[in-house]
């Protein structure tokens, strides 16, 4: 029996769809299986929904004040924006590109040959790619299932996109969990006129971030009206009439809706992975550095493998892996993924102002390296920030004494764009001095790099100056030691 396809991709995620487009561009025969049970079938770009909400919250607040009451308009705007993002990868357009798009539930089978069985149709291919992504964990909170809650999967469907239908937006929210999406959404909802309570089990919000930056974000949220419980555990949840009660110790919080911001779990159910010899754990599918599973014809990428970036699941990382997996599945010459290099991929938390980082945080670097310099610059002295009246924020750049950049953390209006400069510098192994060899636009936020380099030069100048004072003393000490050895020998 001949092979029907070169590559069969399983998953409705944005990464699965981009992988299908990548494969068809390589002249491959491609089938894309969109599982019916996947929430990503309706919203493959769901990760961008809170960001779209945040954008409309910012543009509706020219004076940076809270809206007095929540409106359904921002939600409908965000839904429309997501719909536009999803148009280029809709099933109809994918089919027009020559991709066989099949909606349904299926599983792998190994007899008489390896195939993917969907509605009794056996799809045979040279290789298979699993990019099903992840879904929300079921929170282990007494009463939560009976009371009801919202996750990122369900958030776009909370308010539909019908502009003519009047809908009520929940006014009081409890957000439970320490994932970055919870912090982002808490701030956005507060700006949209909602009363928000953020509950995290950790000692700080954004536990993977530098404490100074996390504290600055926390102060910003509290200034905007978000009530934050740190190191708190929700003991139970119950419903009373139209109100939901969240119990934290002796405190009882009355809300209209609960959002769960816990880490997702890999979507692995019903694919018969054990039957075809694909190893996996509760954290995800086991893969090697070529994104190949324990079955040589089956590849996997993204959050279904449990891969994270900066402590969080990342759509950009998933898309990066999807391209490599497609090329490895179709070519004999394999590209290896350097998992250590994941530490040098940029990451951002889209609060206002946003936080971005790459490489090591200052806390991590101090624990693992010696002779470090933490270069710190505040944007309140940056001309562009002053002209834009957006002076909140600062940056930390972790460098060695030789100038090698180990990591950077930035919090300011343009942090996601600025971090790209330092990410490329780390990847290309440039020093902080190398970054000053080309002129920087002025005024611009990027001027902080020049200022950081000046700080590094000042440190070395002062250090060398201090060393000069002690050089004669060191010479006398060495001479005394030599004389002592000579006398002892005689």
What are these regions (language model features)?
Residues 3-5, 118-127, 169, 248-257, ...:
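Core beta-strand elements of the Rossmann-like FAD/NAD(P) dinucleotide-binding domain
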Residues 8-10, 106, 114, 122-133, ...:
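Short hydrophobic core segments
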Residues 147-169, 257-331:
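FAD-site-proximal beta/loop scaffold in flavoenzymes
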Residues 10-18, 22-50, 55, 352-358, ...:
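Flexible, glycine-rich terminal cap/loop adjacent to redox cofactors
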Residues 5, 21-169, 205-206, 237-240, ...:
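Glycine-rich flavin
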Residues 18-22, 301-364, 441-464:
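A conserved FAD-binding loop/helix module that cradles the flavin
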Residues 170-174, 180-240, 249, 311-319, ...:
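Rossmann-like dinucleotide-binding cores of NAD(P)H-dependent redox enzymes
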Residues 3-32, 174-175, 179-192:
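N-terminal Rossmann-like FAD-binding beta1-loop-alpha1 element of flavoenzymes
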